[in-house]
């Protein structure tokens, strides 16, 4: 059996050893191998005399794709690359656990992203199926039968996508009515083969979502990861003009806390992490900055890792998560180095001590140490000697704390935390919840790349309450 098949079985059923799992995770997140691969790919491209080709994968039913297509014209004008636009189907269900929640979350998330980056998102519901069919048919016609410049095709794509998300068909009817007689004959009989090439390419490139770019063995998801692609192209001197370094600017907001009466603050931030998540690991530093910088109450609410909740993570998704988390971590000065995945008994032991440690005020510090051990030092957090040293380093009594290893109360606590997380339409980590004490107000965000939304909301509330 090929190793990839073993990996596939492993990530859903835990059928290979932890040592193999840990090595694969380290390979996928290795900073050294990451940059070595970039050098190797550029040498290969030069040897094969290939142009710089960036692939973009668009899905008409994906709200993130609607946002991303709006920056394509800027991208083409800014970089000396060949952009190939391909179309893809919805991802397989194995990549989207909790599918209905996933769809609802994406709609809400895309709306937030659009407002933050000055993009347009016209609707808060999925497009109608009959409109999707017509939209793909029109694009299929222009893609294969009509002579059109790439810029004009991008403008057409934005026009079609906007109409689709508005659930209006006037634009479609206008386009179809503009066809000549022969064009209408071709249009009426044309088979829709638009998705075939895109689906095959996306799979070959080891990815699964639309709204993504691919350049020389590396995937970049939507406007969120566009900065990584732009950095790489700029390093290759492919920027056409001396302009802003990024198409999407990630503005930072600041708030003056000097004259604030902190006794009046009633904001609370809840942080939902899990011990096997590289995205959670790279978020701890920024989460700490939030509760140290802003006058908010803070509580950490750990949950079980997805794999310990019987959720499947296919190997291609696991590989992308590790490589992307490492790439994002480097952006914030947090390195993934040696990995020891705590799935199973190590996580259970470590979690069992959390309630008493948290009651003593060290819950966040404890989990932060565990995450550093899992993703930087490569230590087994389930070993008794490790736990004893970690507890002692926190200034706590090991003889008292270790008694909780016999207690199963942590299971109920983590399950309650999970239910709270699900209440906000989130099933993955890290999740953050901002709330007002003695109020029904709750604001959820999921993902280390959404921490800035929580910060922005805190600032907005503080500015409103304290002009």
PLM feature segments, named:
Residues 2-7, 11, 20-26, 34, ...:
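C-terminal cap of thioredoxin/glutaredoxin-like
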Residues 30, 35-52, 56:
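An N-terminal domain-cap segment
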Residues 42-49, 256-264:
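Short boundary motifs at domain starts and secondary-structure transition points
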Residues 48-64, 78, 82-83, 264-278:
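Short active-site neighborhood of thiol/selenol oxidoreductases, capturing the structured segment around
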Residues 59-60, 97-98, 185-186, 274-275, ...:
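Short, contiguous strand/loop micro-motifs
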Residues 59-61, 126-127, 270-276, 340-344, ...:
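Conserved strand-turn element in the central/C-terminal portion of the radical SAM core barrel
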Residues 60, 66-164, 282-374, 465:
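Structural alpha/beta surface segment adjacent to cysteine/selenocysteine redox centers
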Residues 102-106, 190-194, 279, 317-321, ...:
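Soluble or luminal CAZymes and related metallo-dependent hydrolases
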């Amino acid at each position: 059996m090929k190793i990839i098949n073993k990996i596939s079985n492993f990530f859903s059923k835990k059928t290979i050893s932890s040592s193999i799992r840990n090595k694969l995770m380290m390979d996928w997140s290795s900073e050294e191998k990451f940059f070595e691969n970039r050098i190797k790919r550029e040498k290969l491209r030069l040897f094969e005399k290939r142009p710089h080709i960036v692939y973009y994968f668009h899905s008409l039913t994906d709200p993130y794709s609607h946002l991303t297509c709006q920056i394509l014209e800027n991208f083409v004008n800014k970089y000396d690359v060949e952009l190939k636009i391909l179309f893809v189907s919805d991802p397989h269900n194995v990549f989207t656990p909790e599918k209905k929640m996933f769809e609802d979350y994406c709609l809400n998330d895309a709306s937030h992203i659009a407002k933050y980056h000055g993009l347009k998102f016209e609707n808060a519901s999925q497009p109608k199926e009959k409109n999707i069919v017509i939209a793909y048919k029109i694009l299929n016609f222009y893609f294969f039968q009509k002579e059109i410049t790439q810029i004009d095709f991008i403008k057409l794509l934005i026009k079609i996508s906007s109409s689709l998300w508005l659930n209006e068909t006037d634009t479609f009817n206008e386009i179809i009515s503009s066809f000549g007689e022969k064009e209408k004959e071709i249009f009426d009989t044309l088979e829709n083969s638009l998705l075939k090439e895109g689906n095959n390419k996306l799979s070959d490139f080891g990815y699964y979502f639309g709204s993504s770019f691919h350049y020389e063995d590396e995937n970049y998801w939507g406007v969120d990861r566009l900065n990584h692609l732009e950095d790489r192209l700029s390093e290759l001197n492919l920027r056409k003009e001396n302009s802003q370094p990024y198409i999407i600017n990630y503005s930072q907001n600041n708030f003056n806390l000097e004259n604030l009466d902190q006794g009046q603050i009633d904001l609370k931030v809840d942080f939902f992490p899990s011990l096997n998540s590289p995205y959670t690991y790279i978020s701890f530093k920024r989460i700490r900055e939030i509760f140290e910088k802003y006058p908010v109450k803070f509580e950490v609410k750990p949950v079980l890792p997805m794999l310990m909740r019987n959720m499947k993570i296919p190997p291609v998704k696991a590989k992308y998560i590790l490589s992307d988390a490492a790439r994002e971590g480097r952006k914030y000065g947090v390195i993934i180095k040696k990995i020891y995945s705590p799935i199973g008994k190590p996580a259970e032991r470590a979690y069992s001590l959390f309630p008493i440690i948290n009651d003593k005020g060290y819950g966040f510090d404890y989990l932060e140490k565990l995450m550093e051990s899992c993703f930087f030092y490569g230590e087994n957090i389930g070993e008794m000697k490790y736990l004893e040293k970690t507890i002692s380093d926190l200034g706590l009594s090991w003889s008292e704390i270790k008694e909780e290893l016999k207690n199963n109360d942590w299971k109920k606590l983590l399950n309650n935390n999970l239910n709270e997380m699900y209440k906000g339409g989130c099933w993955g980590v890290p999740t953050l919840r901002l709330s007002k004490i003695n109020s029904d107000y709750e604001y959820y965000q999921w993902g280390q790349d959404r921490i800035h939304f929580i910060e922005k909301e805190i600032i907005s509330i503080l500015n409103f309450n304290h002009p």
